[in-house]
């Protein structure tokens, strides 16, 4: 028997309780791009399952699930990065590379999705949005490991705020600082 916890690979999936399953379904499929892979049947509540796509084009059993809450369920305040409520702050969704991320960010802007924050972190370049139920979503691509691996604390503490509207919100530079090493372009 081990005397300490075994480190997991990571988070497997996220389940969100939502007000209106159809509205949330459209957001997560048409705006974010997840694919619906399953739906619970013969249950007293509605729940659907969604998957992203791996680099090999494969789907999983689910990365995300949406469960419709009863009408009397309490809502939440508008999303903010500051912890003003107990529960989920945000979920981060990664695109495979800078080019696909830039296409997604432009797509979001063209669809009228409000950018709440646009930030270059020390390990990601990110846009923060919210879903129809106010869940915070970080749309990101990860910078190369050599940018942050020698000083994770330094990378976590780096934050460059960028414009959230107009063409400026779509500009992404590759002159990233390197934490604990020489400069690398993403």
Segments predicted by a language model, with ranges:
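Acetyl-CoA-dependent GNAT
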Residues: 68-69, 142
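Short, charged/polar surface micro-motifs in flexible loops or helix N-caps
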Residues: 56-57, 61, 71-73, 98-101
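Core segments of cupin and vicinal oxygen chelate
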Residues: 6, 17-68
